[in-house]
UniProtKB/Swiss-Prot annotation:
This is Heat-inducible transcription repressor HrcA. Belongs to the HrcA family. It comes from the Bacteria. Keywords: Repressor, Stress response, Transcription, Transcription regulation. Transmembrane segments: none annotated. GO terms for molecular function: DNA binding. GO terms for biological process: negative regulation of DNA-templated transcription. The gene is hrcA. It comes from Chlamydia abortus (strain DSM 27085 / S26/3). The keyword Transcription applies.
Length: 386
C-alpha cells in the first residue's frame, strides 16, 4: 500500500490494519470483527470488518487463527505498523522506565563499564535482552590482574583496564602450582602494575612464573586489543526472553537464542543501525531475508549512540514480534539522547579517542610498535621485580 495517494477505501483498509495490529499488541490475542468493533470501529458493521479482514488476509497482512477465527497480524503487518505508528511519541513512558533512565551514568573515564551499565538499565526498563557495539577506545591501561587456579596446571588470568574492559584467558602452567603460591604471584603482579614495591618475598621459581604469565597474557591482550576486524559486542539479559509467551515453546526459544547469540548476525544489525539516525526495527522474515537463514520469529530493534555528532555504535534489543513498538521507540530515543550527552561530556573532559576496526590491515598484529602504541601497559623484562 503506497501512502503517496490512497483512495477512501484504501484509507479505511489502512485504518483497519493499524487498529487491528495495535489491539493485538495490547492484548496478545487474535482480533475478531466483534472485538474490533467494540474497541474502536463502532461505526462499522461486523460484516464490513470481516470483508476488510478478508482483503487484508489476501494481501498478506493478516492470517486467520483457526481456533478462534480471529486475525493475527503477519510480519508484513508489523512492518507497516512500525513504519506508520511506532515513532508517534505522544504516549508517556511508565514511571519505572523514567526512573531507570535517570540512573544512566554521567561523565566518566570508565567508558566501557558505563556503556555496559547503560545496556543493563535499558534491558531492565524494557524487560528485553540487550546488546551494544563499541569501537576500541585508545590509551587504555591495565589497572588490575587476578589469577584463579582451575587445577594444578591451568590458571585463568583476568585483566581489567581503566576504561572498564575485562580480558580473560586460560594459561597452561609448565609445572604444578598451588593456591597459596598463585596468590603470592598475583600480589606481586598487582604491586608491579601499581608501581609499588613487592609486599611478599617470592621464590625464584614463583618470580619467573609470574613474569611468564604476565608477559603471555599481555601479548594476547595487546593482539586482541589492537588487531580487530569488527566492533566489540556486548550482550546481556537472555533469560528475559523466558517471560514471553512466544518463547515458551522450546523450538521458538532455541531459534531466538541462537539468533541473538550469533555474533555475526548481531554485529551486522548493529552496524546497519549505527548508520541510521533513528531506531530501526528488523522484524521476523526480514531477518531471514538479510542472513539467508530460517525465520527466527523474533524482532530486533536498534538505535545509534553518538559522541557529539559522531556515531560510536548502536544499542539493540531482541524480543518477540509482538513488541510494544511505540513504547520501545520512545524509550530508545530518550535513552540515546542521554547516552549522547554523557559520552560527549566524557570525550571532551577526558580527551578520549577511539579507533574503528581495520579488517584490511593484515600487518597490524605483526608490528610490536603498533601493538604498543595504543596502550600504556608493557612487558616485564627478565628479573624486573618492582
Amino acid at each position: 500500500m503506497s501512502k503517496s495517494w490512497i483512495s477512501k477505501r484504501e484509507s479505511k483498509l489502512l485504518y483497519i490494519l493499524l487498529t487491528t495490529t495495535e489491539l493485538y499488541l495490547k492484548t496478545g490475542q487474535p482480533v475478531g470483527s466483534k472485538t474490533l468493533k467494540e474497541y474502536e470501529c463502532s461505526n462499522l458493521s461486523t460484516a464490513t470488518i470481516r470483508n476488510y479482514f478478508a482483503e487484508l488476509e489476501a494481501e498478506g497482512f493478516l492470517k486467520k487463527n483457526h481456533v478462534s477465527g480471529g486475525r493475527i497480524p503477519t510480519d508484513l503487518a508489523f512492518r507497516y505498523y512500525v513504519d506508520h505508528r511506532a515513532d508517534f511519541l505522544q504516549d508517556d513512558l511508565p514511571e519505572t522506565t523514567i526512573h531507570l533512565l535517570n540512573q544512566l551514568p554521567k561523565e566518566s573515564q570508565n567508558i566501557v563499564k558505563d556503556l555496559q551499565k547503560a545496556s543493563e538499565l535499558l534491558g531492565e526498563a524494557l524487560q528485553l535482552p540487550t546488546c551494544f557495539s563499541s569501537p576500541r577506545f585508545e590509551n587504555d591501561s591495565v589497572t588490575n590482574i587476578q589469577l584463579s587456579l582451575v587445577d594444578e596446571q591451568r590458571v585463568v588470568v583476568i585483566l581489567s583496564t581503566e576504561f572498564g574492559q575485562i580480558f580473560t584467558d586460560t594459561l597452561w602452567l609448565a609445572e604444578t602450582s598451588n593456591y597459596a603460591s598463585l596468590k603470592r604471584i598475583e600480589t606481586f603482579l598487582q604491586n608491579y602494575l601499581r608501581k609499588q614495591p613487592p609486599s611478599e618475598t617470592l621464590s625464584q621459581k614463583e618470580e619467573d612464573l609470574g613474569m611468564t604469565l604476565y608477559n603471555e597474557v599481555v601479548v594476547r591482550y595487546l593482539t586482541r586489543y589492537c588487531n580487530f576486524s569488527e566492533e566489540d559486542l556486548y550482550q546481556t539479559g537472555l533469560s528475559k526472553l523466558l517471560k514471553y509467551d512466544a518463547f515458551k515453546d522450546p523450538d521458538m526459544l532455541a531459534l531466538g537464542l541462537s539468533f541473538f547469540e550469533s555474533r555475526c548476525h548481531m554485529c551486522k544489525l548493529l552496524d546497519i543501525g549505527m548508520h541510521r539516525d533513528r531506531p530501526t526495527a528488523f522484524i521476523g522474515s526480514e531477518l531471514s531475508d538479510i542472513f539467508g537463514t530460517p525465520n527466527p520469529h523474533c524482532a530486533v530493534i536498534t538505535t545509534p549512540y553518538y559522541m557529539n555528532r559522531t556515531p560510536l555504535g548502536a544499542f539493540g534489543v531482541l524480543g518477540p514480534i509482538n513488541l510494544p513498538y511505540r513504547e520501545i521507540y520512545k524509550t530508545l530515543t530518550i535513552f540515546a539522547d542521554k547516552v549522547k550527552e554523557s559520552l560527549t561530556q566524557s570525550f571532551y573532559k577526558f580527551k578520549l579517542s577511539f579507533r574503528r576496526p581495520c579488517p584490511s590491515d593484515p600487518k597490524l598484529s605483526k608490528e610490536p610498535t603498533l601493538l604498543a602504541r595504543y596502550s600504556s601497559i608493557k612487558l616485564l623484562p627478565p628479573k624486573e621485580t618492582s
